[in-house]
């Protein structure tokens, strides 16, 4: 055996589990040439699973006593439909936005739920397949900022589309330079107010989009780190001869955090969907 072989330290373990399976190493904070294959593939697979679940529920829907899947989907449909009606008053737009909200909620929930998979399970399987235990793999797509910001940018694109569709190019352009401070009959003041209003609108769009993606990413990233620390506690317990405190602490901490995290992943999926509906509702309303 090689003399250099050794068990990873706690910091090495965490750093390894925070690395993505990428096409090229990332050297800059923002680098659009880098593709996180793990996040992309898992997000697409879970997106397909989302569509399969909803399609299956729709295909098996009946007027009689609903099954568990149909009952669960009906509850979600009613919840999303009520929120869509509260935020988007255009019935024609709701025909697309309400189903989209349902897909977003289920999709984000499934991506968040990957955090419930044991930390080392899928990376270990991937390492066995690749015959390299150091091969990185992250399994929570929403703990990747690229995923959450991509979703937030998609919502931003829809905001722009509905602003143009509902208000027209002229109406939206007028809104961009007249809200929130209004305008003036004086040409000079009107120009100054128009520039200030446009700047405020740009700041609002940027702030909404960044916070939309960062909120989901931050919560899921933190949850992932906590699970890693609990896993380290379990590893320390396995190697410790000092008593039962570490094993008991590992079990208690893991159980409590898992139960709490079920609430977190559900709440974060709901918040992300709600913000999407609110932002799309704003695109329909005059400022």
UniProtKB/Swiss-Prot annotation:
Its job: Key component of the proton channel; it plays a direct role in the translocation of protons across the membrane.
Keywords, in A-Z order: ATP synthesis, Cell inner membrane, Cell membrane, CF(0), Hydrogen ion transport, Ion transport, Membrane, Transmembrane, Transmembrane helix, Transport
Pfam family, one: ATP-synt_A
Highest taxon of the lineage: Bacteria
Record's subunit section: F-type ATPases have 2 components, CF(1) - the catalytic core - and CF(0) - the membrane proton channel. CF(1) has five subunits: alpha(3), beta(3), gamma(1), delta(1), epsilon(1). CF(0) has three main subunits: a(1), b(2) and c(9-12). The alpha and beta chains form an alternating ring which encloses part of the gamma chain. CF(1) is attached to CF(0) by a central stalk formed by the gamma and epsilon chains, while a peripheral stalk is formed by the delta and b chains.
CDD domains: ATP-synt_Fo_a_6 (cd00310)
NCBIfam families tied to this protein: ATP_synt_6_or_A, PRK05815.1-1
Subcellular location: Cell inner membrane
HAMAP family: ATP_synth_a_bact
Membrane-crossing segments per the record: 38-58, 96-116, 139-161, 187-207, 225-245, 259-279
MF (Gene Ontology): proton-transporting ATP synthase activity, rotational mechanism
UniProt GO BP: proton motive force-driven plasma membrane ATP synthesis
Taxonomy of the source species: Bacteria, Pseudomonadati, Pseudomonadota, Betaproteobacteria, Burkholderiales
Similarity field: Belongs to the ATPase A chain family.
Cellular component, GO annotation: plasma membrane; proton-transporting ATP synthase complex
Protein name as annotated: ATP synthase subunit a
Gene that encodes the chain: atpB
Topology class, membrane: Multi-pass membrane protein
């Amino acid at each position: 055996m090689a003399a250099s072989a050794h068990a990873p330290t706690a910091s090495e373990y965490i750093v390894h589990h925070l690395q993505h399976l990428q096409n090229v190493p990332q050297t800059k904070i923002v680098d659009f040439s880098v593709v996180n294959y793990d996040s992309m593939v898992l997000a697409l697979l879970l997106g397909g699973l989302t569509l399969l679940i909803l399609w299956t529920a729709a295909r098996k829907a009946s007027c009689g006593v609903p099954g568990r899947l149909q009952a669960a989907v009906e509850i979600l449909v009613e919840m999303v439909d009520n929120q869509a009606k509260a935020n988007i008053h255009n019935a024609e737009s709701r025909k697309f936005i309400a189903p989209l909200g349902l897909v977003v909620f289920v999709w984000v929930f499934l991506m968040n739920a990957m955090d419930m998979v044991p930390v080392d399970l899928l990376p270990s399987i991937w390492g066995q397949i690749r015959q390299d235990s150091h091969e990185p793999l992250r399994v929570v797509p929403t703990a990747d900022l690229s995923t959450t910001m991509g979703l937030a940018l998609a919502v931003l694109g829809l905001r722009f589309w509905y602003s143009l569709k509902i208000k027209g190019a002229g109406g939206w352009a007028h809104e961009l330079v007249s809200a929130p401070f209004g305008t003036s009959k004086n040409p000079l003041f009107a120009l100054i107010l128009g520039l200030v209003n446009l700047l405020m609108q740009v700041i609002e769009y940027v702030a909404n989009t960044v916070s939309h993606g960062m909120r989901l990413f931050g919560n899921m990233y933190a949850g992932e780190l906590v699970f890693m620390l609990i896993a380290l506690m379990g590893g320390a317990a396995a190697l410790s001869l000092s008593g039962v405190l570490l094993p008991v602490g590992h079990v208690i901490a893991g159980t409590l955090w898992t139960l709490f995290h079920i609430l977190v992943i559900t709440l974060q999926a709901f918040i992300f969907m709600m913000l999407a509906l609110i932002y799309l509702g704003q695109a329909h309303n005059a400022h």
